[in-house]
């Protein structure tokens, strides 16, 4: 109901086991013609998209959050919003990092990148595992 007349939703899923499930529910949506589905590796799909996005939600491989951010940043106009999920990672971002914990290392690197990026305004909301809101200036 909140989707504007000319708006589109683009969604990426790497888990091919979810494809039938996702297609089933998208086909039931009154906005099904506005939903673009991509199945595969976001690191390959995102660079190929000739699109501009007003809102991006990142909830994927935590090791690659910084890479996803870099891939989408130039596809965002000023004022666009990025929502990054799990940025407090069950509190693990506050504990000493275990050398084998690549997921937490990825979240820490992402949080550091966002903190240092002067092109954006940002805030981490302490909701569940953390949600970071990032506005492009």
Label every model-predicted segment.
Residues 1-137:
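S-adenosylmethionine/decaboxylated-SAM
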């Amino acid at each position: 109901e909140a989707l504007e007349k000319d708006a589109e939703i683009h969604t990426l899923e790497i888990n091919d086991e979810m494809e039938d499930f996702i297609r089933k529910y998208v086909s039931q949506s009154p906005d099904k013609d506005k939903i673009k589905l991509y199945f595969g590796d976001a690191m390959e799909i995102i660079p190929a998209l000739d699109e501009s996005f007003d809102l991006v939600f990142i909830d994927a491989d935590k090791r690659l959050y910084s890479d996803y951010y870099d891939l989408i940043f130039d596809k965002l106009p000023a004022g666009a919003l990025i929502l990054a999920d799990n940025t407090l990672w069950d509190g693990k971002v506050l504990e000493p990092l275990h050398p084998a914990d690549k997921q937490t290392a990825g979240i820490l690197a992402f949080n550091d990148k966002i903190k240092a990026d002067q092109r954006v305004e940002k805030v981490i909301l302490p909701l569940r595992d953390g949600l970071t809101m990032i506005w492009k200036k």
